[in-house]
Amino acid sequence: MVLDPVLGKESDVTPSSLVIDGDSFAHRAYHGVPKSVRRLGDKGGGAIVGFANFLLRLYAQEKPRAVLVGWDTLDAPTYRHCALATYQGGRAFDAELMDQLDVLPQFVAACGLACAKAPGYEADDFLAAAVAQEERLGGTAVVASGDRDAFQLSSDRTTILQPVRAGEMARIGPTEVRERYGVDPKHVPDFIALRGDPSDKIPGLAGVGPKGAASLLRRYGSLEAALAQGSFAAQAEQLRLYRAIATMDASAPLPPLDDQTPTWGAAAALAREWELNQLANRLAAIDGRSQI
């Protein structure tokens, strides 16, 4: 039996690791919580509160053995930016969002949960590394991400949680990936290379949309097989680059992901220090239930 520290109930379910794209959900929180939510020094607090509420809700739902939150390093380019000048071009973040992204890892750490952030890597890469480690050790993982690139991580041991509407998450396994994209999870980078990704400014192959990309992959089996047969010879170098950019880097460095006991009380103290008192009260109440 496993004690759920949030709900104070026991569960027979074998816990998975929970891996979260921190930037993805911090952005959603920033745009979903009123800007009137302030913290100490009249700084923005909405993204912190919204992300914290999301984290608590997801923790109660999944009852994980461990949590890892991956973060982008926005002040340092990754190899993707160096390889493709247009990658993620035109993105701009409000100063208040940047400020909260800077301190959210501190909040997650106060909760007793793991964070991963390093120059040259994106949050996606830490998700891939954590999933690879968990599967290698025979465990299971749940990956929460608003980025469909994460579908490439789906397997019989890893489920993707994708936000679909307010407060709701779709559970994506290999069957759902095939239904949505018409390809297996391992071919999602090939699919993105052919179709392109407007949000990341990956151009793709001119004139090829989602159906065309899926059709080409069904015909050839993979992008590499298509290139080996001489297809798209003039674009081969670029397509391989697009595939590499769309592929999550499972070699990203990770902190230890041993079983965790959340420290909601410490997180409550930090929230109170930041004068986010409603959040502090909620965390303190959860901490009180987990001690029973």
Please provide the spans of the model-predicted regions:
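Noncatalytic, basic helical substrate-engagement surface that gates or grips nucleic-acid strands
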Residues: 5, 11-144, 148, 152-159, ...
